[in-house]
C-alpha cells in the first residue's frame, strides 16, 4: 500500500541518507505526488511517467536499489543486476520462487506476505527496512 511504502522510505532514511526516486506509470502519477508530499522531509523526487521503455530502462539503470511490487520493472532491474527488493502477496500464483529476478542472489531480497489479505504486507516495516539496509545497503 502507499502507506507501507511511505513507512518503508521513512525507516530506510533513518538508517542511511539516500535520495528516493518514485517511478510509476501514468495511472499512479498522482499517488506518487501525494506520497512525495507526505515524505517532504526526505530527499525525494517523482519521475514524470512517459510511454518510453528506453526512458524507464535508463531510470532503472541509474538507481542503486530498486524496490517494487510490480514484477515487470523489477525484472528489468534484475536483468541489469541492480539490487532489488520485491514484495509478493500471499497467493499461490505470486510466490517469489515463481517470479524471482535473475540478478545475483546477493543483490536481491524478497518478502512474501504471510496474511490472507493480499492488499498489504503484514510484516513489520521497521524490520524490513533494517533487513534491506543490512543485506543490500551497508
Name each region found by the language model.
Residues 75-137:
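Nucleotide-sugar donor-binding patch of glycosyltransferase catalytic domains
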Amino acid at each position: 500500500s502507499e502507506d507501507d511504502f511511505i513507512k518503508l522510505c521513512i525507516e530506510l532514511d533513518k538508517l542511511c541518507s539516500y535520495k528516493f526516486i518514485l517511478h510509476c506509470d501514468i495511472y499512479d502519477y498522482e499517488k506518487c505526488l501525494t506520497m512525495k508530499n507526505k515524505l517532504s522531509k526526505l530527499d525525494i523526487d517523482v519521475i514524470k511517467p512517459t510511454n518510453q521503455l528506453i526512458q524507464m530502462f535508463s531510470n532503472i539503470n541509474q538507481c542503486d536499489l530498486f524496490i517494487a511490487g510490480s514484477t515487470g520493472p523489477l525484472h528489468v532491474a534484475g536483468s541489469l543486476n541492480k539490487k532489488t527488493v520485491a514484495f509478493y502477496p500471499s497467493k499461490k500464483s505470486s510466490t517469489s520462487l515463481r517470479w524471482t529476478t535473475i540478478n545475483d542472489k546477493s543483490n536481491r531480497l524478497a518478502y512474501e506476505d504471510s496474511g490472507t489479505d493480499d492488499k498489504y504486507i503484514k510484516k513489520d516495516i521497521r524490520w524490513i527496512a533494517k533487513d534491506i539496509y543490512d543485506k543490500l545497503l551497508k
